């Protein structure tokens, strides 16, 4: 019996004028997710998805390339203004933000939403080099 050809679901173009850019900058990677106001994902990218491997993922340049990619995908959906939520201690925080502004988005607000414990879990042991 012949297999029925599976149809590739074409990504429909959403017309969304404003959204939220979530920048998650960890020590190992930087992930950028652009959502609408309700939190539905419009586009995403990360340093690892851009082809950077190992310690190169944690560089500011990798974060910049990932932010440019996510911004380009979001612009295809008609997005023009962004609120930015930055989370995490990584080195790609500022460069990702700068790349989003350089991509032509109007950044209306920047929030740091890094979770800070009120003396919660015991931290991992200190690294001695």
Swiss-Prot record:
The keyword rRNA-binding applies. Belongs to the universal ribosomal protein uS11 family. It holds the Pfam family Ribosomal_S11. HAMAP family: Ribosomal_uS11. Part of the 30S ribosomal subunit. Interacts with proteins S7 and S18. Binds to IF-3. This is Small ribosomal subunit protein uS11. InterPro entries: Ribosomal_uS11, Ribosomal_uS11_bac-type, Ribosomal_uS11_CS, Ribosomal_uS11_sf. The gene is rpsK. SUPFAM superfamilies: Translational machinery components. Located on the platform of the 30S subunit, it bridges several disparate RNA helices of the 16S rRNA. Forms part of the Shine-Dalgarno cleft in the 70S ribosome. GO terms for biological process: translation. GO terms for molecular function: rRNA binding; structural constituent of ribosome. GO terms for cellular component: ribonucleoprotein complex; ribosome. Gene3D superfamilies: Ribosomal protein S11. PANTHER family: 40S RIBOSOMAL PROTEIN S14/30S RIBOSOMAL PROTEIN S11 (PTHR11759). The keyword Protease does not apply. Keywords: Ribonucleoprotein, Ribosomal protein, RNA-binding, rRNA-binding.
């Amino acid at each position: 019996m012949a297999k029925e050809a599976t149809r590739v679901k074409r990504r429909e173009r959403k017309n969304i004028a404003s959204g939220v850019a979530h920048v998650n900058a960890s020590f190992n990677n930087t992930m950028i997710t652009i959502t609408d106001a309700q939190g539905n994902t419009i586009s995403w990218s990360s340093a690892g998805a851009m082809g950077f491997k190992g310690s190169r993922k944690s560089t500011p340049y990798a974060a910049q390339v990932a932010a440019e990619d996510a911004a380009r995908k979001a612009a295809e959906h008609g997005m023009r203004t962004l609120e930015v939520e930055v989370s995490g201690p990584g080195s790609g925080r500022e460069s990702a933000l700068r790349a989003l502004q350089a991509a032509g988005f109007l950044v209306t607000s920047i929030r740091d939403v890094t979770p800070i414990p009120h003396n919660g879990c015991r931290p991992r042991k200190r690294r001695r080099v």
